[in-house]
């Protein structure tokens, strides 16, 4: 079997071109069985050490991860009916295996024996942390529960894994399930050339004439921002805001209503089973924040600081619309459009006119120049690597001693059958192997930008540049780690509310004149962003800053409060919670038929359940960390080395607050965030 199955015994990088749906389940079954056998085998030993117990377990789990990682990645970037089915059928197997491990008394006792052994005192910080985390995770997998309750735990976890996947599929299908063809260009007045060309290319790819629009962000956003045709904006908003729900043009077709209810009900049951009062308490058991009240207070405090300014920003927008356009009522599909007009009126700048200054190669070489200056790390493209699509590129990161530190796949463009958004995921983690050698980490960096059109290179908006830098921040956290214990290397073991620190930190340079000098360069002439455009860009940075942060707070408070108070007996709780949160924080009145929760994948299909607050929580850390660069010089290699050594290389081996204090010399303060966000005191 292993002869013909490329997922078995992967050495090095995944053989993407050889992986077929029929390989998936047999490989997963075989590898899970190997893992079970190894566990039973190592437990027969009379005495447990790191070498005879942890390392063999790490190796066999690694073989399973190495097969599953490319499969899970393909499910996100090259989704097909066959692949989806193969992926789905493995979820219960993986879930059952992970529950079996988490409730294995023998394994638990072996970890406990290690913790209580004489050798434990000599272990490294990372080794100790990995063992302590494992013991905590046993507790959170129900190791102490009765057999009956353990079985129920397993059922819940397996069902949740299925539901998360179903939620995600519904959103993808609903996004792909709506399109609009427009033949008359006159109906598209105001749309920038790049958006028209992309829509034309999209139509041609389907053998159609005219302009094809979809609900993918590169297609949807330009219409909402620039298109004069209000009816089209409303139609697209309606389709987008009701995806995967019982409302809108595809009402009921891919409806997530029941999926969400069941997810929330099961999460509450899971939390209570493990002895917590609410799912938020369970969520925080592995996070930096100490208790639910601390998170709610943090979010409420930020909302209080931002709301008056948000109201003022909206009044200014309304005043502008009335004065310039005689418009007195703003619907949700008008906000983006008129905000863009107001922004141009105030700052004479728009995202579109900056695109020519951010061609793909210039932006990427600028990003690499930055990490060379601050971290002394070089990025070098490696050709001939097997990938899942011809547009995917592959790079190595090399340090000042010519050591390979890590590598990554870069997949930048939106295409069909690829889930939306931008993300970093790990392909291979850093670890010390049984033979003593070090495995270097590999990451996937995925975005959804417009591909090159005609003979022009891909041209990014400034917002997309920031997104790329953000994901690259996650990437270097994973790739530059110096921890050899895989459970706490890179992003492993990093509390969820601290994981956004490096990513949000990297965004800062996208707003610095000295950095933009080499991140930008006109695709025809190579000249960097002209001074006056740069000045306007920086002035416009905090345009509607409070309205933006209030939108983030709306998501964060909704997620946390919903998980904090959800009660399966009550009906309509999801929409009622959203309504009450909106009345607390939102300045823009929504419409009753909008269904944002139904496509809120972060909390129903991603890892952000009762954790969406993490973005803002970590931004307090990242803004304050960056303020040290502002004080000492934004390319200061000494400050850079300190950030690399104290934070990036440490992975999850120590508590984030300790690492932060080591870098900053004190606890984090909120002021830098408010200043960066343009929230006035």
From Swiss-Prot:
Annotated Zn(2+) binding sites: 470, 474, 477
UniProt EC number: 3.4.24.70
Organism expressing this protein natively: Haemophilus influenzae (strain ATCC 51907 / DSM 11121 / KW20 / Rd)
GO biological process: peptide metabolic process; proteolysis
Catalytic activity: Hydrolysis of oligopeptides, with broad specificity. Gly or Ala commonly occur as P1 or P1' residues, but more distant residues are also important, as is shown by the fact that Z-Gly-Pro-Gly-|-Gly-Pro-Ala is cleaved, but not Z-(Gly)(5)
Lineage: superkingdom: Bacteria
Keyword annotations from UniProtKB, A to Z: Hydrolase, Metal-binding, Metalloprotease, Protease, Zinc
Protein name per its UniProtKB record: Oligopeptidase A
GO terms for MF: metal ion binding; metalloendopeptidase activity
UniProt entry tagged with the keyword GTP-binding: no
PROSITE patterns: ZINC_PROTEASE
Record: active site: 471
Cofactor: Zn(2+)
Function, as annotated: May play a specific role in the degradation of signal peptides after they are released from precursor forms of secreted proteins. Can cleave N-acetyl-L-Ala(4).
Sequence similarity: Belongs to the peptidase M3 family.
Entry's cofactor comment: Binds 1 zinc ion.
């Amino acid at each position: 079997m292993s002869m013909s199955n490329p997922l078995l015994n992967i050495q090095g990088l995944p053989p993407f071109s050889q992986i077929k749906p029929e390989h998936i389940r047999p490989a997963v079954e075989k590898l899970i069985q190997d893992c079970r056998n190894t566990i039973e085998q190592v437990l027969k030993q009379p005495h447990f050490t790191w070498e005879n117990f942890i390392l063999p377990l790490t190796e066999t789990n690694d073989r399973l991860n190495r097969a599953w990682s490319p499969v899970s990645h393909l499910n996100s970037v090259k989704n097909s009916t066959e692949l989806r089915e193969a992926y789905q059928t493995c979820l219960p197997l993986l879930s059952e295996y992970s529950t079996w491990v988490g409730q294995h008394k023998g394994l638990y006792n072996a970890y406990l024996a290690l913790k209580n052994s004489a050798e434990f005192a000599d272990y490294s910080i990372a080794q100790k942390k990995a063992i302590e985390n494992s013991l905590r995770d046993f507790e959170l997998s129900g190791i102490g529960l009765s057999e009956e309750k353990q079985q129920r735990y397993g059922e819940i976890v397996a069902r949740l894994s299925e539901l998360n996947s179903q939620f995600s599929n519904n959103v993808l299908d609903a996004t792909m399930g709506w399109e609009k063809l427009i033949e008359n260009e006159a109906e598209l007045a105001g749309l920038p050339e790049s958006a028209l060309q992309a829509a034309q290319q999209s139509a041609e790819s389907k053998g159609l004439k005219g302009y094809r629009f979809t609900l993918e962000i590169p297609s949807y956003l330009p219409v909402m921002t620039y298109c004069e045709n209000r009816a089209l904006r409303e139609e697209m908003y309606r389709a987008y805001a009701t995806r995967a729900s019982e409302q809108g043009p595809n009402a009921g077709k891919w409806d997530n209503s029941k999926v969400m209810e069941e997810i929330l009900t099961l999460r509450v049951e899971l939390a209570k089973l493990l002895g917590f009062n609410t799912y938020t308490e369970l969520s925080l058991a592995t996070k930096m924040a100490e208790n639910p009240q601390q998170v709610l207070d943090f979010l409420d405090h930020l909302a209080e600081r931002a709301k008056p300014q948000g109201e003022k920003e909206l009044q200014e927008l309304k005043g502008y619309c009335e004065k310039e356009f005689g418009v007195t009522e703003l619907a949700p599909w008008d906000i983006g459009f008129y905000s863009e007009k107001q922004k141009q009126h105030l700052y004479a700048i728009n995202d579109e006119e900056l695109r020519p200054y951010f061609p793909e190669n210039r932006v990427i070489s600028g990003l690499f120049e930055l990490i060379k200056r601050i971290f002394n790390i070089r990025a070098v493209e490696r050709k001939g690597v097997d990938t899942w699509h011809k547009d995917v590129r592959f790079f190595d990161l090399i340090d000042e001693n010519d050591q390979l530190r890590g590598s990554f796949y870069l997949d930048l463009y939106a295409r069909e059958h690829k889930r939306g958004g931008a993300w970093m995921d790990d392909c291979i983690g850093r670890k010390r192997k049984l033979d003593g050698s070090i495995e270097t980490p590999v990451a996937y960096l995925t975005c959804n930008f417009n591909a090159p059109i005609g003979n022009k290179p891909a041209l990014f908006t400034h917002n997309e540049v920031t997104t790329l830098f953000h994901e690259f921040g996650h990437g270097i956290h994973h790739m530059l780690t110096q921890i050899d214990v895989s459970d706490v290397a890179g992003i492993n073991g990093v509390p969820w509310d601290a994981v956004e620190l490096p990513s949000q930190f990297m965004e800062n340079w996208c707003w610095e004149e000295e950095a933009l000098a080499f991140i930008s360069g006109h695709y025809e002439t190579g000249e960097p962003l002209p001074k006056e455009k740069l000045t306007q860009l920086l002035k416009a940075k905090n345009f509607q800053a409070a309205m933006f942060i209030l939108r983030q707070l709306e998501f964060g408070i909704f997620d946390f409060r919903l998980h904090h108070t959800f009660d399966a007996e009550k009906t309509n709780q999801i929409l009622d919670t959203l309504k009450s949160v909106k009345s607390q924080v939102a300045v823009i009145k929504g419409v009753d038929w909008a269904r944002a929760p139904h496509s809120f994948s972060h909390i129903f299909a991603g890892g952000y359940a009762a954790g969406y607050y993490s973005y803002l929580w970590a931004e307090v850390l990242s803004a304050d960390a960056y303020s040290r660069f502002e004080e000492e010089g934004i390319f200061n290699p000494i400050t850079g080395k300190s950030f690399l050594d104290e934070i990036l290389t440490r992975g999850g081996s120590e508590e984030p607050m300790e690492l932060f204090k080591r870098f900053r010399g004190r606890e984090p303060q909120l002021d830098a965030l408010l200043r960066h966000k343009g929230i006035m005191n």
